[in-house]
């Protein structure tokens, strides 16, 4: 009887595994009745902060540190934080610090979607990061950020907020949009930089043997860089799927390179 139960359990696990593996680009898809993850809290995307000590707005009229074309490194934090305030852990701070140290002539931006004060546990980390003259920590308002871009009407329609992973897909949108608007480099908050990027242009990392990664990539202000950035933003808009986690991140840069290079094999 025990063996039968074990075999039944094993068979059930295999069936679940098969169901979870998509036949499209080997991307794991969402199975609604099996989704036990916490629903993304995205209320901060539309919330107006009344905090007097909240971080400065990016692209505000009072901003004196307008991004320099192509000389920027962007990190985005798209989580919404509660009453405890904005949080940044030591690993994330290490990623930002490494980018600033290895690229002293580039401006490193950490952009939060949630606007609030920093949590007590984060104050010391932030103070240390801001000791670097090329580090900027700002708040970004998605509704304003998409204005006068190919994504303005699309974002206003509310499609992204209906995603199964709105926070992750917001991050996908912002990384391509930041490079479209200003040029430069985007890095995930778990990427530690060990060398200079200052002479590296128009690049992306490898996700695996089939897909290009969206966690490390750069588009400069050259004709090629502008073409890549524009193609990625338009692919994101055209092929966005809220039910496929990786379709809007690595999927975008992979499809774009396949199209521009006229090949299925870009790795």
Model-derived regions, located:
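Glycosyltransferase-associated regions of secretory-pathway enzymes
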Residues: 1-171, 189-267
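Residues at helix C-cap/C′ positions in short coil/turn segments immediately following an alpha-helix
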Residues: 104, 182-183
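Small-residue hinge/turn detector
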Residues: 172-182
